[in-house]
């Protein structure tokens, strides 16, 4: 039996408020912004989903998929964003499994490639992501790295 449970928010919609608060606490994006995206996903208004890793009833990892992760290249869509694993649960493959689940989910829906904005180097390459180009983040002074998963 797997130590952790990996789910989409559609599998446990009752976690929406808790998940929005969790993502807000990690990234500082308003909880309402997460709720709006999550509600659209749960109402089947979008196929761009939310993926969580649970340790018992605690969220220990998660990510979402949205149209645009606040950058100047709207043609590079959809974007995996808000990738986070609790420090106490890192180095166990949680983020990698969540990334793979998101890419597999998108492919199953006929959506490919997927994109991701990050300042990290080398981490995402382990999971099949390739550096594509530099993009300008909304309100950001410096360019940031855009990756693609084909």
Question: What do these predicted regions represent?
Answer:
Residues 41-47:
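Short loop/turn motifs at secondary-structure junctions and domain boundaries
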Residues 1-37, 50, 54:
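Short amphipathic alpha-helix that is part of the acyltransferase structural core
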Residues 108, 112, 118-142:
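Conserved active-site alpha-helix within GNAT-family acetyltransferase domains
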Residues 48, 141-146:
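Short hydrophobic/aromatic beta-strand or adjacent loop that forms the aromatic wall/cage
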Residues 69-77, 81-82, 87, 92-94:
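Helix-adjacent hinge/juxtasegments
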Residues 50-52, 58-68, 79, 84:
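Conserved beta-strand in the GNAT
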Residues 54-56, 149-150:
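Active-site beta-strand termini and strand-to-loop segments that position acidic
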Residues 85, 91-104, 116:
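Conserved acetyl-CoA-binding loop-helix of GNAT-fold acetyltransferases
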């Amino acid at each position: 039996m797997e130590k952790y449970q990996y789910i989409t928010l559609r599998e446990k919609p009752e976690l929406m408020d808790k998940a929005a608060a969790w993502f807000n606490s990690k990234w500082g994006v308003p909880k309402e912004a997460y709720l709006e995206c999550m509600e659209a996903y749960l109402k089947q208004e979008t196929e761009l989903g939310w993926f969580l890793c649970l340790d018992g009833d605690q969220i220990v990892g998660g990510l979402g998929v949205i149209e645009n992760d606040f950058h100047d290249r709207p043609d590079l869509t959809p974007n995996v964003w808000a990738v986070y694993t609790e420090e106490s649960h890192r180095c166990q493959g949680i983020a990698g499994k969540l990334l793979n689940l998101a890419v597999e989910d998108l492919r199953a829906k006929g959506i490919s490639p997927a994109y991701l904005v990050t300042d990290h180097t080398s981490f995402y390459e382990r999971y099949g992501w390739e550096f594509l180009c530099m993009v300008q983040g909304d309100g950001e002074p410096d360019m940031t790295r855009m990756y693609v998963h084909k």
